[in-house]
Every structure is written in C-alpha cells, then in structure tokens.
C-alpha cells in the first residue's frame, strides 16, 4: 500500500520542497471493504505512524547545507492584510497554483529552491543551476513565439556572476538600516538583479518574475530581522508583507535626500559673495538651501547663517564683518538688507562713472583744438598725443623732419628780409637829390 511505502521510506518526504505543506492524511487507492478485519488495526497503526511522522518532520529547503556558513534564521513577518501581492508584474494566483506555488499567501511557505541563497555562500544544487537574469546589452530581445515553450524550462545563464559575491551582513539595529540597505542593494546587483532595483529616479528597467520576488523576499527576511526594522519599513510590510521593492525604492530616495543634505551643508559653508551677482539672487540661493535643510528636520539658526555668510563676503561688503563682530543678536533678514543697500550704491556709482568721464574728455578736446587759442604748447602736446601710438623710430623721423623744415624756412625768411632791406636802401639812394651829393 502507498501508506506502507511512505512508512518504509520516510526520507522520500524530504526530497520535495513542498513536503512541509502536504496533507496530513495519506489517501489510499485500496478499497477499505477488501481489507480483512485482522489487517484493519495494523493499517490504522501504520497510518497513525505516517501522520505523526509528517507532523514532526520539519520543513526542508532544496538548498544543500553548507557547513562553512550558518544562515541566519528568518524573521517572523506578519501575514498580509490587504490580500495577495499584485504589484510589479507578479504572477496571478491562478498561475501560481499552476506553477505548484500552492502556498502563495503564507510567507513561511514561500519556498524557492535554487533562489533561496546566493551562489557565493551556498553551493547550488547541480540539478538546479542558479539562473541569471540580466542579458548582455548587445543581445537582441527573444522571439515572442519561443517564449511559450520556455515556461517549463529553467532560465539559462546569460551573463557571468563573479565568484566573490558576498552576502550582506545581518542587520543589528534600527539606526544601521540605512547603511545595511546599501550593502543589500549591492548584493542584489552582484547577483545580476540590478535591473529590477529602482534607480535614483525610482525607475526600474524591467518587471521582476515571481521567482525573483521570492528570492528577494527570502534574503531580505533572512538578513533583516523584523523587530530591528525602522518604523516606516514596518508600516510598509504590515500592509503588504512581501512588498520589499517599495522598501528598496524609498530607501534609495532617502539616500538621495541624505546626499542632498550633505551637498547643502557644503554649499552653505562655502558661500562667497563679492557683488558680481545681484543681491536678490544671492539671498534666494541662501534661503533655498536653508529651507531645504529645514524640510529634512535640520534647523539652521540666524546666527549660524549670518556667520557663514559674513565669512564669505569680500570687496566692498567685507567691512560688514567688523560691524557684526560684536553683535550677539544677528538677524538674517537685516544682513540681507545691508548687503542689498551696498549693492545698490555700487550699482548707482558704476552707472554714473562712464557719463562723467565722457563729458570731461570732450571738454579737454575742445579746449585743445579751439581756433581762438594762441597757446602753441597745447597744440603741440595735442599733436604728439595723436602720434603716441607710433614707434620710437617714427617719432625720431618726424622730429628730424620737422626741425629741418623749420630751419629751411628760417633761412628763407632771413634772406627775404635782407633783400628787402637792400632794395629799400637802393630806393632811398636813387631818390636822393643831386645837390646832396655835392
């Protein structure tokens, strides 16, 4: 009989991953009326032994035991309150039943044979090689016709996985969860599951399968005990015990927030202002940083903000340091008002400087080129000013030429003067009367 065979081979129950969820009653194909009265008690005793053995037999896993590593005990997770997990492209309950996942609603019964652990710290079953999920970037998408014949097959490895994939350490406290989840995400990426992990924008490259979800659930439960999880993680898991992907998505978002906090502190500590930008722009930049830190429960006092701003002032704004050095009650709004006042004064001065310089230069040019002036020095200086851009050789040539020309003109003027005087004397002699010669 079948029950007697089970009694004779009790180890056959351990060969299946679903031994812990089989029925407690062993059906028999034999007609009970055909059994003699003498054999009925023995049949009952055998059935009782088999049933008692089933009750005492612990649930086994399809992952072979590794004597070099002790796997942490899975934490107790509360049962789901909002029904089955239907997100992220998971299998429907009908498909799960058809795939022998009969106990989809019970987290303790989510057996996942070769997905249970990482290949780095458990030796996988040679009959069930660990599949990899990330195809190479150069490979084309598979033919949809061939997908129908691949439901019953075990996925083959598409890319290599390093042999040094290390498991994440076990979570030890609620405060260390943000650090622990970084190692857990790195562990999933090294296990070729990085394309189902949300990126910085909360986006994923593809939908995960039910087996991948079971693998993520089991490893998360094994290394993160429920009583050590933060409150916000417990709230998510109490609504849906298996929604690990939402936990990872919010964890990535919180990482980005922490990185932004660090960037804001660095920007606030390195503030610099010299008036090259408008005072309004500087005030908006500083106020935005302070408000962003305040939203993350980090309050920056006015005194601290004023000290950081004063440290970065330069140029005409530098004297504000001495003004605020002895002040104990610093107001950020007052400091911004004084910076704005100095900026406006400098702006007005810069607008008036070009017009004053233009009027003064025009007045100088008119005085130098006035036709009524008799000052030759001004004209000569203006002449040399126009040729100031010429090289020294050209200047020397011009000076020599001008001196030679002036010397020739002077000689010509002297000769003309002498000749005119001589002619005048001759005229005077010719006009004298003859009586005067005697």
Curated annotation (Swiss-Prot):
User: GO CC annotations?
Assistant: cytoplasm
Q: Which Pfam families match?
A: TYA (PF01021)
Q: Where is this site: Cleavage?
A: 397-398
Which UniProt keywords are present, listed alphabetically?
A: Cytoplasm, RNA-binding, Transposable element
Where is the protein situated, by its record's location annotation?
Cytoplasm
- Beyond the main fields, what else does the record say? Retrotransposons are mobile genetic entities that are able to replicate via an RNA intermediate and a reverse transcription step. In contrast to retroviruses, retrotransposons are non-infectious, lack an envelope and remain intracellular. Ty2 retrotransposons belong to the copia elements (pseudoviridae).
Fill in the domain comment.
The C-terminal RNA-binding region of CA is sufficient for all its nucleocapsid-like chaperone activities.
Summary of subunit composition and partner proteins:
Homotrimer.
Q: What is this protein called?
A: Transposon Ty2-GR1 Gag polyprotein
Lineage of origin = Eukaryota, Fungi, Dikarya, Ascomycota, Saccharomycotina
């Amino acid at each position: 009989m079948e029950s007697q065979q089970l009694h004779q081979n009790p180890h056959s129950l351990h060969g299946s991953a679903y031994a812990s969820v089989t029925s407690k009653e062993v059906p028999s194909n034999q007609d009970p009326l055909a059994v003699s009265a003498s054999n009925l008690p023995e049949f009952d005793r055998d059935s009782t032994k088999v049933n008692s053995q089933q009750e005492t037999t612990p649930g086994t896993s399809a992952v072979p035991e590794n004597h070099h590593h002790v796997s942490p005990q899975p934490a107790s997770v509360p049962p789901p309150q909002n029904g089955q997990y239907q997100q992220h492209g998971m299998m429907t309950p009908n498909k799960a039943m058809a795939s022998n996942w009969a106990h989809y609603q019970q987290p303790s019964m989510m057996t996942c044979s070769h997905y249970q652990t990482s290949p780095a710290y458990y030796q996988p079953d040679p009959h069930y090689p660990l599949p990899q999920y990330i195809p190479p970037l150069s490979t084309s998408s598979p033919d949809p016709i061939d997908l129908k014949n691949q439901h019953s097959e075990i996925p083959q490895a598409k890319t290599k996985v390093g042999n040094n994939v290390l498991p994440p350490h076990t979570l030890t406290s609620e405060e260390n969860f943000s650090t622990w989840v970084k190692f857990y995400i790195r562990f999933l990426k090294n296990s070729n599951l990085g394309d189902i992990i949300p990126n910085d924008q909360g986006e994923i490259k593809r939908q995960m399968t039910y087996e991948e979800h079971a693998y993520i659930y089991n490893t998360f439960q094994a290394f993160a005990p429920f009583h050590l999880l933060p409150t916000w993680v417990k709230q998510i898991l109490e609504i849906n015990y298996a929604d690990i992907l939402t936990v990872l998505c919010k964890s990535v978002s919180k990482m980005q927030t922490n990185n932004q906090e660090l960037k804001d502190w660095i920007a606030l500590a390195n503030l610099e202002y010299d008036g090259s930008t408008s005072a309004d722009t500087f005030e908006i930049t500083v106020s935005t940083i302070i408000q962003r830190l305040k939203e993350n429960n980090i309050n920056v006092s006015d005194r601290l903000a004023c000290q950081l701003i004063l440290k970065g002032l330069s140029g005409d704004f530098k004297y504000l340091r001495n003004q605020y050095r002895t002040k104990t009650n610093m107001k950020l709004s007052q400091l911004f008002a004084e910076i704005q006042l100095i900026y406006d004064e400098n702006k007005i001065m810069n607008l008036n400087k070009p017009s004053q310089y233009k009027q003064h230069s025009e007045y100088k040019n008119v005085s130098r080129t006035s036709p009524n002036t008799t000052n030759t020095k001004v004209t000569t200086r203006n002449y040399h000013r126009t040729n100031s851009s010429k090289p020294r050789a050209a200047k020397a040539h011009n000076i020599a030429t001008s001196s030679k020309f002036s010397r020739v003109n002077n000689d010509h003027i002297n000769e003309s003067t002498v000749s005119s005087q001589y002619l005048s004397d001759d005229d005077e002699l010719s006009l004298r009367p003859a009586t005067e010669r005697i």
